[in-house]
Amino acid sequence: MINELKAQLGQSTGSVDSGIKIVDPLADVLTELRKQLGRTGDGAANVVEAKRLDYLPFGADKWGRDVLAKVIQGSETSILVGFAAAIVATILGTVLGAFAGYYGGKTDDALNWFYSIFSSIPYILLVLAIAAVLKQKGVITVVLILGLTGWTSIFRLVRAEYLKHKARDYVRAANAIGASNLRRMFVHIFPNISHVVLVQLSLHVVLFIKSEVILSFLGFGVPVDVVSWGSMLNESQNELILGYWWQLAAATVFMAVLVTAFSLFTDALRDALDPKLK
């Protein structure tokens, strides 16, 4: 009796398998793949680990994309945003600081009041608030947000330099020969304070690269179809829970190297251009 039941079960199982094969012609292929990859988490992790060590220096993400290629492409986005936003902030801060320091009086008071409003709000909170209000992701949006909010320190330094230089003899000589105010501001005074502006430009590149990473990590930065270090860190959160740490390591290592290199470059540039150290 028992043998007859076993035979009937075997026949029914075979009929089910044959039915599955008829409905899904790839059933045999999928079954073979499941046997190769394994059904447990340890087996899948071993396969990914083997690929990471044997084929890809930094492994692959959950979609199978090369992490090294992603981190290189992400560096392009972060550097582009950092440089573009630093240029916007430097131009804005230099122009406003030049007008405030050169003209003084009510112009200086109005621009200082404008500066006080921006500087009284913590920078990161201001950036996050503006990004949340705009609700429009994109590289240009991030550049404008960072550039239009990060000009305050440049304004303060440029204003102080113009207050100091506008009363010097070479500016008075330019006034005596009939040079206009704009010419005195940007042709005679600006070349003598350009070292301050260049150093601030380099410092703000580092600041804005880190700010872009923070924005993209929180979901307020570049869109999902644009690779950046911040979006890679965002993706690596779920992977880190499963033990896939290499995307997080790649993004952080590349960012640390770039920020350290720019910081060393800024220190060297300050030493080379500062007239007090010559």
Language-model regions, residue ranges each:
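Membrane-topology segments of multi-pass transport proteins
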Residues: 1-63
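Alpha-helical transmembrane segments of integral membrane proteins
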Residues: 60-278
